[in-house]
Regions:
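Acidic, proline/glycine-rich low-complexity IDRs
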Residues: 1-41, 52-139
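A short glycine-rich, His/Asp/Glu-containing loop-to-beta-strand
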Residues: 44-46
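Generic secondary-structure microfeatures
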Residues: 48-50
């Protein structure tokens, strides 16, 4: 069953850089995806007011921009493992607007995310562990 594309999801926002608004519909999400594909805008960030917890992970936002090598879309998902500081941003290239819309619809309506095993790690914002022991000057 497909979600109601005109229903307003009040705990979600859309940010396109020049403006951000709270309370979004899937119809607005779809319009933004096609605007990116048509190169009318650079990106869209879709985020919940609070991170969504799924399988011991916190999902913070989804960002979509044009794929550099094709006329398709690039999608990124920000994930923080429970107990970790800092997010990992996963990305996937060459996605059509309907594929991306399905991922976003599942996130907004059903609090579901695809398995990210095959996705590329675009950015790892977790703090690095120190692999050395500092010498103490006060010994």
């Amino acid at each position: 069953m497909t979600a109601d594309f005109d229903k307003t999801y009040t705990d979600w926002s859309i940010d396109v850089g020049t403006y951000k608004y709270e309370g979004i519909t899937l119809n607005e999400v779809e319009q933004n995806l096609y605007a990116i594909q048509d190169q009318e805008q650079d990106f869209v960030v879709i985020s919940p007011s609070n991170a969504i917890s799924i399988d011991n992970k916190q999902y913070n936002f989804v960002q979509v921009c044009s794929d550099q090598d094709t006329d398709l879309l690039h999608i990124e998902i920000s994930v923080t493992n429970n107990g970790d500081r800092g997010a990992i941003i996963y990305g996937k290239n060459e996605q059509g607007p309907q594929e991306v819309l399905k991922i976003i619809e599942d996130f907004i309506v059903h609090n579901k995310m695809p398995a990210l095993d095959s996705w590329e790690i675009v950015l790892d914002l977790r703090p690095k562990m120190e692999s050395y022991v500092k010498d103490s000057e006060n010994d």
